[in-house]
């Protein structure tokens, strides 16, 4: 493992050579959660104060570490994340019984509450220090345990609502060793296309006004890897189409395959000036 000084030196050298524009700092547990979190804090403190590194820093909060340590680190970082590891508590208990779901969620709740508190401080005192101004995120491993896509996007939706996360990252499971609790090795490799569909669905949850229950259900629990989730929704809701672009509201326009939030905004703005036709849509890049 690297010492705080070594991480700082490497970061500055790479930055000066234009190899990097920021730092993502993570760590396994060394000795104890507090010991590890202290090392992370010292690294960020040195980077910010001694090396005057003011670029983007994304850092991991260590579950089980002292709240004060996490808070002090948060004032030095731009973004902080806690890995959820696996989508469900059952999966975590099966593959990582030494880890506790409550311990993972606790620092998430701490970061959320501290962010809200800090926003009030900044509103009153303009020069107050910022606490993780880029928000918090998490990551889930996909394919190591038998959760369906429906379960996974429901977990993501819940995290966005309850913890106000900025991003949920999905990582396709890669076999590195054999274990009776892991899925059998196949020649197909990591489920990268499934990971891609989950990212597309996640985008629909965050920016397009979809809910998890609209995209999948217990009867239809997994995405079609051959069709993107938005197009799949449209195929299952043909009663909603065709859509009249001159009358449909912004939220319905967002549900039309091929129309993104920028195009939907352009349509709503342009139709105030008159009726739109195919040529108008083509000029806007919608078709």
Regions found by a protein language model. Give the residues of each.
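Conserved Radical SAM active-site core
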Residues: 1-138, 142-146, 159, 177, ...
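Long, highly charged, low-complexity intrinsically disordered interaction regions
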Residues: 181-255
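Residue-level signature of tetratricopeptide-repeat
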Residues: 270-271
């Amino acid at each position: 493992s690297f010492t705080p000084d070594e991480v700082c030196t490497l970061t500055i050298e790479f930055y000066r050579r234009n190899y990097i524009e920021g730092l993502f700092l993570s760590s396994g547990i060394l000795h104890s959660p507090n010991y590890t979190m202290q090392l992370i804090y010292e690294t960020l403190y040195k980077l910010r104060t001694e090396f005057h590194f003011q670029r983007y820093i994304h850092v991991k909060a260590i579950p089980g570490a002292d709240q004060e340590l996490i808070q002090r680190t948060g004032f030095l970082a731009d973004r902080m994340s806690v890995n959820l590891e696996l989508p469900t508590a059952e999966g975590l208990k099966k593959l990582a019984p030494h880890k506790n779901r409550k311990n993972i969620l606790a620092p998430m709740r701490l970061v959320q509450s501290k962010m809200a508190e800090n926003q009030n401080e900044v509103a009153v005192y303009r020069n107050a220090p910022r606490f993780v101004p880029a928000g918090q995120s998490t990551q889930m491993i996909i394919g190591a345990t038998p959760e369906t896509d429906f379960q996974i996007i429901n977990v993501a939706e819940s995290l966005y609502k309850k913890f106000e996360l900025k991003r949920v990252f999905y990582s396709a499971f890669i076999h590195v060793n054999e274990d009776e609790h892991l899925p059998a090795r196949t020649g197909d490799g990591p489920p990268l296309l499934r990971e891609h569909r989950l990212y597309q669905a996640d985008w629909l949850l965050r920016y397009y006004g979809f809910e998890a229950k609209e995209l999948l259900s217990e009867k239809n629990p997994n995405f079609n890897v051959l069709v993107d989730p938005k197009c799949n929704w449209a195929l299952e809701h043909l009663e909603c189409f065709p859509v009249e672009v001159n009358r449909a509201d912004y939220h319905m326009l967002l549900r039309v395959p091929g129309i993104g939030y920028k195009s939907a905004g352009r349509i709503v703005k342009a139709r105030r000036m008159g009726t739109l036709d195919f040529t108008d849509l083509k000029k806007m890049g919608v078709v």
